[in-house]
From Swiss-Prot:
Involved in lipopolysaccharide (LPS) biosynthesis. Translocates lipid A-core from the inner to the outer leaflet of the inner membrane. Transmembrane domains (TMD) form a pore in the inner membrane and the ATP-binding domain (NBD) is responsible for energy generation. It is a multi-pass membrane protein. Residues 351-585 form the ABC transporter domain. This is ATP-dependent lipid A-core flippase. Residues 38-319 form the ABC transmembrane type-1 domain. Signal peptide: none annotated.
Length: 593
């Protein structure tokens, strides 16, 4: 496929995506077509106005003065009617552009909720947000501005060419000075534009923030089933942005008609002045002849701008096509695979990993991993960085799919379960705690479909050793904790994350311990909170603390994507193998209790 064919195919697909909005656009184009044809006619009408509005020899007679005054009144009425049509046309055309933005941003955001982990691994947050925001704006140019420019300026050019050919060089053009009127009007409009722009930019920042937060925390959103909640939050911010942009469009659409009405009033005033004070029954004023020249000159001057606009259309389309390619890349990206149809109403928490293998491309990460985890057990996975521990937990959650082997949950292959059902039985407490720019209450009740009482949240906070510090916050559990819990300390953020998992009360917990040490007091209360969390569920821990491995029911030592040792702490120490070396090398003895 040639580049020209590719551009044509993409542009055609783009227009098909918004075909349901084309009626909206067609109405705007129709109104533009009518009133731009009238524009060309108005320029030509300078000829009869000046020729028949003056007496023999070009002077002003009583009869021609009456004609001029009638023409002045008629012109104001015509321009006013035309301006109303122009406003309607510009509003519909501008609204079409914003409807395209609104549609594509919704479609892309909804698609992001369904994309697999591999997509987020390949693309940075900035790239994704840029496609969601900036690229969509570029597409707007192709679906509104480019189409309208061809219709609008193409029609105008044709009309002006006709005028130029049928006119003659016999009149000069009145120059209308409207500076003071326009200056005052533009000053008022500019102030309103600045205020609307500030509101729009501020609301767009909220849209960007929510989108970035969603992308950064996509695992938590899915594990806790909060897709709809986050989607509603995003749409609320987007709705406000949309309303501000529509107000801006309306103001922009109003500006040009008002200026034209002011100009027509000045022109009418000039005609009245000539009719009243310029009457000369003896032959008139010869300098007011040559109407055909005036209409030709006006057409010649007016044709420059639409021709310039038409030359810019190709640039607009090329930019839009490049943006469209990126947008369709996201919309066409394969969704997270839903391989299962079974649903388990209740799970005990038995997890069996059989001969599991996985690779990222050519890089083998896991090879023949087998582990049996009984319900209620705490199993600690240890090993140096890159040994496959985190990848294993991601496969359990089905963010990745194994190439070989199987993972069983209570004897059922996890690939046979629906994603929503599987993840409803899992909780995650990440090494890097992910919290949302929301209240303590909403962070802990995050993603739960049922109504959660304040008492339930408080109970979870107490069990997580977090209620004491939450009580001291300005609004208690209804205090906003900032972006990713920025208003809290590291230990406090961890305890909020633990309280969230406690409230969900899933039978299987995946816990990736933080590698950085807390102060002794924070470490103590976090450990107590973890004990409360793990006592009622199966716990899979990526361990970084000596106290964790000492208390685990089983320790699995991984190296190079394989299980090399397995057993209890003391048993492995007595073997004197890789685990003993990792204890001496990797674990800080100050964590031991």
């Amino acid at each position: 496929m040639t580049n020209h064919q590719k551009v044509g195919t993409l542009y055609k697909r783009l227009l098909l995506q918004v075909k349901h909005l084309m009626a909206f656009s067609a109405f705007g184009c129709y109104r533009k077509y009518i009133f731009l044809s009238a524009d060309a006619s108005m320029i030509y009408l300078i000829n009869p106005i000046l020729n028949y509005g003056f007496g023999p020899g070009g002077g002003i007679t009583k009869q021609s003065a009456t004609i001029l005054m009638l023409m002045g009144v008629g012109m104001v009425g015509f321009i006013a009617l035309r301006s109303v049509g122009s406003f309607v046309s510009q509003y519909f055309i501008g609204s079409l552009g914003q409807k395209v933005v609104y549609k594509f941003r919704k479609d892309i955001y909804k698609r992001l909720m369904d994309l697999p982990a591999s997509f987020f691994d390949k693309h940075s947050t900035g790239q994704i947000i840029s496609r969601l925001l900036y690229n969509v704006d570029q597409v707007t140019e192709a679906t509104s501005t480019a189409i309208i420019t061809v219709v609008q300026d193409g029609t105008f050019v044709i009309g002006l060419i006709v005028v130029m050919f049928v006119s003659s060089w016999q009149l000069s053009l009145f120059l209308i000075v409207v500076g003071p009127f326009l200056g005052l009007f533009i000053s008022i409009i500019n102030k309103k534009f600045r205020n609307l722009s500030r509101n729009t930019q501020s609301s767009m920042g909220n849209v960007t923030h929510t989108a970035e937060e969603t992308i950064r925390n996509y695992k938590e959103i899915r594990i806790f089933g909060a897709q709809q909640k986050q989607q509603n939050k995003f749409f609320k911010n987007l709705d406000y942005t949309y309303s501000q942009q529509i107000r801006t469009i309306a103001l922009d659409a109003l500006t040009s008609p008002v200026i034209q009405i002011i100009a027509s009033l000045v022109l009418a005033f000039s005609l009245f002045t000539i009719a009243i004070f310029g009457t000369n029954d003896g032959g008139g004023s010869s300098w007011l002849t040559a109407g055909s020249f005036a209409s030709f000159f006006a057409a010649a001057a007016a044709i420059l701008k639409p021709i310039k606009n038409l030359t810019k259309v190709n640039v607009v389309i090329q930019k839009a096509v490049a943006a469209t390619e990126d947008i369709f890349y996201i919309l066409d990206y394969p969704a997270e695979k839903e391989t299962g149809s079974k649903e388990l109403a209740k799970v005990d928490g038995n997890v069996t990993i059989k001969d599991l293998s996985f690779a990222f491309g050519e890089h083998k990460v896991l090879s023949g991993v087998s582990v049996d985890i009984k319900a209620g057990q705490t199993v600690a996975f240890v090993g140096k960085s890159g040994s496959g521990k985190t990848t294993l937990t991601s496969i359990i959650s089905r963010f990745y799919t194994q190439h070989k082997g199987e993972i069983l949950l209570d004897g059922v292959d996890t690939r046979e379960l629906t994603l929503e059902n599987l993840r409803s039985h899992l909780s995650i407490v990440s090494q890097n705690v992910h919290l949302f720019d929301d209240t303590v209450y909403n962070n802990i009740a995050f993603g739960l479909s049922r109504e959660v009482s304040e008492d339930e949240v408080i109970d979870a906070l107490k069990r997580a050793n977090a209620y004491e510090f939450v009580q001291e916050l300005s609004d208690g559990i209804h205090t906003n904790i900032g972006n990713n819990g920025s208003k809290l300390s590291g230990g406090q953020r961890q305890r909020i994350s633990i309280a969230r998992a406690l409230l969900k009360n899933a039978p299987v917990l995946i816990f990736d311990e933080a590698t950085s040490a807390l102060d002794n007091e924070s470490e103590r209360v976090v450990q107590q909170a973890l004990e409360s969390l793990t006592e009622s569920c199966t716990t899979i821990v990526i361990a970084h603390r000596l106290s964790t491995v000492e208390n685990a029911d089983k320790i699995v030592v991984m190296d190079g994507g394989k299980v090399v040792e397995s057993g209890k702490h003391q048993e492995l120490l007595e073997q004197g193998g890789l685990y003993t070396g990792s204890i001496n090398r990797d674990f800080n003895s100050t964590y031991a209790r």
